[in-house]
Amino acid sequence: NSVFILNKIGFDKLNESEKYYPFKLDFYSISCNKICDLDLTPFNSANDKYTTLKRSTLTKFLKEKLLSDSIIFNKKINEVKQKNGKIDIHFVDGSSDKVDYLMVSDGVFSNSKSIIEKKFFKQNYYGAIAIRTQINNLDILNLNINNISIIMGSNAHLVLYPINQKKELNLVCIVRKKLEENN
């Protein structure tokens, strides 16, 4: 994950009560029978741990820590090159910029990943909707609220994970709807 980079701008100083460090990733069937788990601790170092938190907490942190002139909005990337330890970004409008780090967060249907990686990525999100909410951990039965839980079904999957030390949970549900053919 990107904690190593975020720590360079002070993420490690963020209030510990606003972060959570899950130990495992648990996989369940749609009927909540546990299939297996993955230990996340081997991916951690002393300073860089697998971390979950509220999206709003991360957004606020980034807005406070990054200079407003270092965030570029509403630009389409045309080309990305690395030269002498810097990243040279060329935009569709003819402008360009040199940066140390490039973070792109423009959605799953963006072509930025294809441009940066210099290969085509086909999106596989047809006929799906995503629902996101936060819930109280008391609402969850039979799941380990200390871990990230993935519940998998044939047309849906749910991901639950703690987002702070109060163990409030994020719930993300992806549902694929089979489209009926018109006769």
Tell where the protein language model's regions lie, with residue ranges.
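Short beta-strand-to-loop capping motifs
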Residues: T133-D139, C173-V175
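Conserved N-terminal helical subregion
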Residues: V3-Q134, K178-N183
